[in-house]
Amino acid sequence: MKTTKTTTSRFENLIGQEDVKRKLNFYLDAQNKSRRFPFVLLAGAKGQGKTEFAKEAARSILGNDGKSRPFLEVNCGTIKNAQVFFEQVFSPVIQGNEVTVLLDECHALPKDLMTTLLSAFNTEKTDVKQVNWREGMYEFNFKLQSFILATTEADRLFPPLKDRLTLVDFQPYNEKEVAQIIQLTLPDIKFVGDVLERVAKTVRSNARSSVQRAKQIDLYCETKNRREFSSKDWADLCERVGINASGLVNAEIQVLKTLKERGECSLNMLSAVTGLSRGALQRDTELFLLQRGFMRIEGNRKITAAGIKALEEATAKK
């Protein structure tokens, strides 16, 4: 039997994102009374826990029997067009049933389906909306069905559809929250002294990276056949798997070295010197450096004082 969580117990195993929790709790409390849940858009960078928060919220969305509704997770990248959605997902699983649907990476929805959902989500005056698609008629009942959408690229959503959604946006995790996630993931491991804080400084401010670092520590402790992790162990692990100060990866170190040596660079020059494509630099390598304040872009790319310090720490033993 599924149990209903209270406002105070929801999300208790998820660290941080207090603003997200407050917003979702408000909408969940309302749904438990009215059976209507808004069309929520969970938006944030990769690894910030959108899917986990969606799953946890879904457990508190109640059906007419007062129990949690069934949950359906749809990877939108697998939906080729509206016809596939209606014939393979909506008709057999959603229509006429009580269900909470997560449309994950919803920016990847095909345009014809985004347009159709725009019509379906226009529900100012009714809980039931009938949508015609080609030769079929499909019925959405929003007292039976709730839709949660999640994306890392909200700017790619069809703007009119985005306007129909209730935004719940995520923030980066701070070092204290990162440390809490690692500790929660490894409840049986004792961290000695300030080693957990040192570990947290190398994590990329998101939940997924925190869990990945925790798994590395867990594997290390298993190989040593002990459940205690010290600063000496951390130094050994960093050496073995190549963990650098501030969590810098080799491509980022290469960019910082280039900027320090040359003073400043255009994107084309940085690409030529490092061998990384312009797209790879802009979409991946530069993002973390900009977020941490290790570089800035003022026409050309420049390293900052914080970037010089991070580079020196990351290359001190190299």
Tell where the protein language model's regions lie, with residue ranges.
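Conserved catalytic/switch belt of AAA+ P-loop NTPases
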Residues: 29, 111-141, 156
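C-terminal helical "lid" of AAA+/P-loop NTPase domains
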Residues: 197-201, 208-223, 257, 286-287
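Terminal-proximal interaction/regulatory segments of ATP-powered molecular machines
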Residues: 260-318
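Walker A/P-loop
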Residues: 29-74, 90-93
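Short glycine-rich substrate-engagement loop in P-loop NTPases that contacts/grips substrate
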Residues: 21-22, 68-98
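Conserved AAA+ ATPase "SRH/arginine-finger" region at the nucleotide-binding site
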Residues: 152, 166-178
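The conserved phosphate-sensing helix
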Residues: 192, 203-218, 228-230, 248-250
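Pre-Walker A (pre-P-loop) alpha-helix and adjacent loop at the N terminus of AAA/AAA+ ATPase modules
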Residues: 2-45
